[in-house]
Amino acid sequence: MTGDILFLAHRRPFPPDRGDSIRSWNILNALADIAPVHLVSFGEADEAASAALAEVCASVQLIPHRRTKIGAMAASLLSGRPASVELFRSAAFAKAVSAVMAAYPVRVIYAFSGQMAQYAPTGGQGPRFVMDFTDVDSQKFASYAKAGGVSGLANRIEAARLLRFERAVAARADVSLFVSAAEEALFRRVSGLTEPATAVLENGVDLTRFCAGTWPRPQAAGDAPLIVFTGQMDYLPNIDAVTWFAHEVLPLIRDRQADARFAIVGRAPTEAVRALGALPGVIVTGEVPDTRPWLSAAQVVVAPLRIARGIQNKVLEAMASAKAVVASLEAAEGIDACHGKELLIAQTAAAQADAVLSLLHDPARRVAMEAAARAAMEARYSWAAKLAPLASYIGLDTRQVAA
């Protein structure tokens, strides 16, 4: 490929320790195998991240994120733009983008997350514009709006503004990418657009990092049957999921398995999440250096999300770790796995409790599901396989990559 790639990110891709950074880091590496990549991202510079990014990218500019949510909401009231877009509006970021465009022969702009579209030049015969929406964010806010009240009204306004923004961005992008066929279809339905090019670029999982290894059992895990949830614990869908599970599902499980414990594993737990630790059988770990020892210790991993967009990395990682997973329909959406063989899908509190107990009480079934889950990930979810279409999406024939 003649020319460079400009990669725009709303959050630093390294370390790849949460859903969006896992995807952006792997895509960044794949793009760097095709052409020189220049990264402009929000985030603070630190030695480890700077070194890792410098190994992959031809140039790196990390712009501190200073705007607050309150400031973004105020700006949104004045501008009519979505608050989630205003949150990432920055003169310093725009200046960094302009500097890269002036200094290097940029042929492709890869915008990771909708908020970054505001920095892609408009009009003229500029670089190819690839918009990686990943999820349909407007519909996430539409889900939040169902809560009602003042926050529900605010989220309903944000959902409407963001959908208008997403529609306008897709109309000018050369291709818009989504993490699953379900997200792509949802966008086409809610946007009403038929002309813009859309495509699917699914997530994979690191099959070397997440595997059926044995790690020392965390002391806090104890010796009783362990049910584990992993995730960023200041993220509303995760907060909602663990709160519902701890209050509605775990008591049903403990009625029949009195010593069962539920571990909520992830950084930045809110006060509401920390308070769950006072409930019988609930462990709240806070940030841990590595989630794999907790996955290794688990008899069952759960993903009881009621609000979810895209593909859940937490489910892929658990399955790659050869763990039996009980997931909601929302959490399992977009994942190519067979219910009853490679994971269990359950929706109501009673159904989730029954599913977890069936695995706790039938070790042979659990072991068979663990093996099937790992085999499914090996067969269908390597990052190399999932990102194979990337070259064509940036306007490069895959035969050119091979050459």
Q: PLM features: residue spans?
A:
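Conserved catalytic-core segment of nucleotide-activated headgroup transferases in glycan assembly
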Residues: 171, 189, 195-297
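Acidic donor-binding loop of glycosyltransferase active sites
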Residues: 174, 281, 287, 296-310, ...
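Acceptor-binding helix/loop patch of EC 2.4 sugar-transfer enzymes
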Residues: 10, 67-87, 127-167, 185, ...
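N-terminal subdomain of nucleotide-sugar transferases
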Residues: 1-61, 102-104
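A short, well-ordered alpha-helix in the C-terminal region of glycosyltransferases
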Residues: 365-380, 389
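Short hydrophobic beta-strand element within catalytic cores of glycosyltransferases
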Residues: 314-318, 324-328
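Donor nucleotide-sugar binding/catalytic pocket of nucleotide-sugar-dependent glycosyltransferases
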Residues: 130-131, 138, 155-189, 193-212, ...
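Conserved acidic donor-binding segment of nucleotide-sugar-dependent glycosyltransferases
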Residues: 343-350, 358-363
